[in-house]
Amino acid sequence: MSRFLAALLSSAAISAAAQPLPLERIQLPPGFRIEVFASVPNARSLALGDKGTLFVGSRSGGAVHAVAPGGKVFKVADGLSMPNGVAFHSGALYIAEVSRISRIEDIEKNIESVKKPQTIYDRLPSEVHHGWKFIRFSPDGKLYIPIGAPCNACERDGYGLIGFLDLKTKVFEVHSKGIRNSVGFDWHPQTRELWFTDNGRDWLGDDLPADELNRAARGGLHFGFPFCHQGDTPDPEFGRGRKCAEFEPPAQKLGPHVAALGMRFYTGSMFPAEYRNQIFIAEHGSWNRSKKTGYRVSLVRFDSSGKIKSYEAFAQGWLQGETAWGRPVDLEILNDGSLAVSDDAAGVIYRISYASGR
């Protein structure tokens, strides 16, 4: 991202947050409601603390914020390098910058006066192209970290992967390769398999390739980048002499250039039972397509056998014609079962709730 664009988005976020947002334009299934939960400049990745504090990373703002359950916002870290990723584990907040991971211990004990982040790992690549990180802890306590490709399409060792950091040994290991730029992943609540989004490459036209929702049933898989896209489309440069059958296909093709970022399996109790263990995806929206697409929260549904049966819109309306007034980034399930959605363009956190009879 250029400095000009980053400044423009930051300015837009501050402006939008200061003005009422046209939430009446957001279309949701019957019974659902959306509201602004908090205003947070350049709100990006989300993580929930044990006491219900919602931590919010940023990309262009250089700061990390905390939103108390009542909606009050605190700045807990500043002056950082693209602190997009946040994760909470054993009472501590973990922050991912471009090239390092830092930690703030016992952060919820005194949220108004927190300690300075302490670096725990500083051997990540320093390239800023796809250099902002999403982080999340696996069920077995490993900190998973993606390393995006430092390009639109290229073959570089040590990039285009998802790996994990062992907090005790400080050893980083590769889990999966062939991933252009993942900015969201989660583990299936029952199978514990890793699922993740991946942003497809640019400049192959409006309709190619699709962004991907991928399932890593085990480690060691290769998902195709830069040789093959969307499971069936060889790259015009890097795909020569390679077959897409060599690689793991996507579990679901998403829209082309929708910029699928955060994803969550819904495990709350507020929404109807049909949403349990289904996947919500934040689609940030296209930037170089002749007709814009994305700018919504989508829903991937499974059938009773665990196979994907549909990919559809859940919340849409941030895109009006060719004008977008918001860009969803990440999602988190709050303690009451409602769904928090970050928006870095509008500079807010939304709360989507459900009540029968609405």
Segments from the language model and where they lie:
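Asp-box/WD-like beta-propeller blade repeats and closely related beta-sheet repeat scaffolds
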Residues: 82, 99-138, 146-151, 171, ...
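Conserved beta-propeller blade signature
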Residues: 53-57, 92-95, 142-146, 193-197, ...
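Beta-strand-rich domains and repeat architectures in extracellular enzymes and scaffolds
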Residues: 35-60, 258-265, 281-282
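Surface loop/turn motifs at the tips and blade-to-blade linkers of beta-strand repeat domains
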Residues: 35-41, 74-79, 120-127, 174-178, ...
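Short loop/turn segments immediately following the C-termini of beta-strands
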Residues: 58-60, 98-100, 106, 148-150, ...
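Blade-loop segments of beta-propeller domains
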Residues: 65-91
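Beta-propeller domain segments
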Residues: 19-28, 132, 149-152, 157, ...
